[in-house]
């Protein structure tokens, strides 16, 4: 299951999960507030709206009919997927791409995370500390932004390959 605002960022990761036999559900959040960075009230509003849409979208899913549940999420989606799993007492495997600090306020057993050290949305030191506290394996990508990209195409291709290999091993 993919939690994010734009599935184009994780198309290859979703394809890996599909190839491993996972059914894919792309959770859509509808319209969220803009310009939320640095505005705690807007961030909380975005979270509440996204979680509400997620609850509605997934209300008829029979989680007990699945042998294994994998959540793939990015950015705000990491908070939403973690909150949803917690609310519904689900045992899931989670791949957290560019998680925000609030993601780590939930149980994250069975998760791995990927973070770029130049991510303007989450400070590396904070993410490292929180991941260590929750015992979440964290893969850092040096000089990468919130999309795990550096701006150098060849470097980004190498990053993508390394990331995909790690994701495939995890799945």
Label every PLM stretch briefly.
Residues 1-65:
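Serine-hydrolase catalytic machinery in alpha/beta-hydrolase-like enzymes
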Residues 88-101, 110:
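A conserved short beta-strand
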Residues 144-159:
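Catalytic histidine-centered segment of alpha/beta-hydrolase-like enzymes
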Residues 123-136:
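Conserved loop-alpha-helix segment in the C-terminal half of the alpha/beta-hydrolase fold
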């Amino acid at each position: 299951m993919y939690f994010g605002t734009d599935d184009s960022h994780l198309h290859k990761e979703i394809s890996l999960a599909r190839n491993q036999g996972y059914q894919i559900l792309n959770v859509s959040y509808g319209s969220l507030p803009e310009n939320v960075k640095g505005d705690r009230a807007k961030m909380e509003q975005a979270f509440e709206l996204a979680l509400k849409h997620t609850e509605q979208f997934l209300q008829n899913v029979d989680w007990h009919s699945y042998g294994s549940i994998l959540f793939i999420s990015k950015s705000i989606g990491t908070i939403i997927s973690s909150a949803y799993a917690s609310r519904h007492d689900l045992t899931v495997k989670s791949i957290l791409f560019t998680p925000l600090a609030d993601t780590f306020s939930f149980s994250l057993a069975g998760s791995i995370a990927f973070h770029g050290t130049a991510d303007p949305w989450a400070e590396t030191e904070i993410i490292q500390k929180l991941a260590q506290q929750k015992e979440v394996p964290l893969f850092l990508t040096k000089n990468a932004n919130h999309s795990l990209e550096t701006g150098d195409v060849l470097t980004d291709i190498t990053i993508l390959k390394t990331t995909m290999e790690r994701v495939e091993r995890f799945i």
